[in-house]
Amino acid sequence: MNVNIYIETSFKGPATRRAAGAWIVEYIISTGRPVTRGGILYSDGTTENDLALCLVEKAFSILTKTCCAVVFTECGHVLRTMQNHWLAQWQKKGWINAKGKPIRNAEAWNRCALLLEHHMTEWTDRPHEYRQCMQDRLRKELEREHGMPAAGYAEIETPEWNTPTCNTERRS
């Protein structure tokens, strides 16, 4: 099965701040119908890297069969880690980087490694048809104060995201 995974965060950079991120998994079922599933994560204090890593974990956690996945993300650290195969190197070295220092968020990286091990993946920062609607949705969600947790992460499941308009009404 071929799958596209889209990861978007509400901000860029290493600063810790209030943020939201969205993930979408898109695939074709046996009837030929495209299906999208996704969610939004909120955090009161996170970095882009940490949030993107959590989003990758959430997206891959719904996959129940081995697949070929193309992952679209603008998070430079996650993208470079995957494209340069650092994840496998860190895992072999006991979660120590090339400088001999412990990997930050080793537990989260390990969870991702376990989720990814049965899949073929390609990682890219190419533009995609969901980017703008995901960013718009994140901006709207962050504007609603009641949607943000006091601390830690909170998650909501989103209805299907329709291509390309991202109509978020449920399909029957």
Give names to the regions the model predicted:
Residues G94, H146-G147:
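Short, flexible coil/linker elements and helix-boundary hinge sites characteristic
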Residues Y6-E8, V56, F72:
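Short hydrophobic segments within beta-strands
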Residues M1-D50, I62, R137, E141, ...:
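RNase H-like nuclease fold core
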Residues E48-L53, N105:
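Short, charged, low-complexity patches
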Residues L53-S61:
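An active-site-proximal "capping" alpha-helix that borders the catalytic cofactor pocket
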Residues F11-T16, S61-R137:
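RNase H catalytic domain
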